[in-house]
């Protein structure tokens, strides 16, 4: 059976790995391929700061709560493993800051040690009157994609650099199952009026004295439009740009100045930090992520398609739960083709 995953960001590679781990032993003739025109370090995943944190408001789809939890638990289970360094995985603590009180987030019991800030802590951030502190995880996209690629290569997965023009093209090429993980570019393969780019721009700096993340929130301006500072394994990410519908991949001087001014106001010592890089990427914004099966009619044959895209700015936060769900959908396809019998549920 030939399975083609389109897309080599965190969604595509994690989905491919989930399918390999669950079905390679029962499908001896599994021919799994990854098609993409961009591989690491040129994907949107490479641009992401990598902090595990969902949106503040609860998702419309209750399954997304479970997928977020599954991802956090999966990453946390690796935190003391020999793989953690290669994955770009580490614990990180920090602050979410607000001008005034807001409800607790739905994920407060997923992270470690969630609590409200004390008055003394808020004195450190005089422009803000309310906030939270907790410990989360950082998973750096560039390292993680390299680790996933290595795991897939060990399992015999083949990678092809090519620009796919349509799902039909892949079906005609002999794919039995197509897994569409094309993120913000999914609309080029199949029209999706709900999908839009959420352009972001970030500055990477060398600032090893920054030990805590600081995320600010301004409900009036909207998500990602106020300063944030996120320390990674080697570098610190500065951001605060979100432009819906903007496809411009070129770094903007105006956006650079907005980020720099906002982050240096939040943490004045950053003025002494050396800038080591600046990047632009696109969040695949959709009212609800798309994770479902579809049958594609090509000629006289039906090709199975699993869509897994539209994760907005939280792809790294929810990726493993979505990969597990996509693998489950793949298992149902195998069962219908009488190639696999699903294990009985113990619920």
Curated annotation (Swiss-Prot):
Maturation and modification: Phosphorylated in the cerebellum; probably not by PRKACA, PRKCA or PRKCE.
PROSITE patterns, per the entry: DAO
Binding site for D-dopa: 53, 283, 313
Tagged with keyword Ribosomal protein: no
Residues given in the record as FAD binding sites: 8-11, 37-38, 43, 45, 49-51, 163-164, 182, 283, 312-313, 315-317
EC category name: oxidoreductase
Residue segments, region Required for protein stability: 1-16
Organism per entry: Cavia porcellus
Residues annotated to bind D-serine: 224, 228, 283, 313
Protein name per Swiss-Prot or TrEMBL: D-amino-acid oxidase
Location of the protein in the cell: Peroxisome matrix; Cytoplasm, Cytosol; Presynaptic active zone; Secreted
Region named Active site lid that may open upon substrate/product migration in and out of the active site and close to increase the hydrophobicity of the active site, to make the hydride transfer reaction more efficient: 216-228
Record-stated family: Belongs to the DAMOX/DASOX family.
Biological function: Catalyzes the oxidative deamination of D-amino acids with broad substrate specificity. Required to catabolize D-amino acids synthesized endogenously, of gastrointestinal bacterial origin or obtained from the diet, and to use these as nutrients. Regulates the level of D-amino acid neurotransmitters in the brain, such as D-serine, a co-agonist of N-methyl D-aspartate (NMDA) receptors, and may modulate synaptic transmission. Catalyzes the first step of the racemization of D-DOPA to L-DOPA, for possible use in an alternative dopamine biosynthesis pathway.
């Amino acid at each position: 059976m030939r399975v083609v995953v389109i897309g080599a960001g965190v969604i595509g590679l994690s989905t491919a790995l989930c399918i390999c781990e669950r079905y390679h032993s029962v499908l001896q003739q599994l021919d799994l391929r990854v098609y993409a025109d961009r591989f690491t370090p040129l994907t949107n995943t490479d641009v992401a700061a990598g902090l595990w944190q969902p949106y503040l408001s609860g998702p419309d789809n209750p399954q997304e709560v479970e997928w977020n939890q599954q991802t956090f638990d999966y990453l946390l289970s690796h935190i003391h493993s020999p793989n953690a360094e290669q994955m770009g995985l580490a614990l990180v603590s920090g602050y979410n800051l607000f001008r005034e009180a807001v409800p607790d987030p739905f994920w407060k019991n997923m992270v470690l040690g969630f609590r409200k800030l004390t008055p003394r802590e808020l004195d450190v951030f005089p422009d803000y009157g309310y906030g939270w502190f907790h410990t989360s995880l950082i998973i750096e996209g560039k390292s993680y994609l390299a680790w996933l690629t290595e795991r897939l290569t060990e399992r015999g997965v083949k990678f092809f650099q090519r620009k796919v023009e349509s799902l039909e093209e892949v079906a005609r090429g002999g794919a039995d199952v197509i897994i569409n993980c094309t993120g913000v570019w999914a609309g080029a393969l199949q029209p999706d009026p709900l999908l839009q780019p959420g352009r972001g721009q970030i500055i990477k700096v060398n600032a090893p004295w920054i030990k805590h993340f600081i995320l600010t929130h301004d409900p009036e301006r909207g998500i990602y439009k106020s300063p944030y500072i996120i320390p990674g394994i080697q570098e610190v990410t500065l951001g605060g740009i979100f432009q819906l519908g903007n496809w411009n991949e070129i770094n903007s001087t105006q956006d650079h100045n907005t980020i720099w001014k906002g982050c240096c106001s939040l943490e004045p010592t950053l003025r002494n930090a050396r800038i080591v890089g600046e990047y632009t990427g696109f969040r695949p914004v959709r009212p609800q992520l798309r994770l479902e099966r579809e049958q594609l009619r090509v000629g006289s044959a039906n090709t199975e398609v699993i869509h897994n895209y539209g994760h907005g700015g939280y792809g790294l936060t929810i990726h493993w739960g979505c990969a597990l769900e996509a693998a489950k959908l793949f298992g149902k396809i195998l069962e219908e083709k009488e190639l696999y019998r699903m294990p009985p549920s113990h619920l």
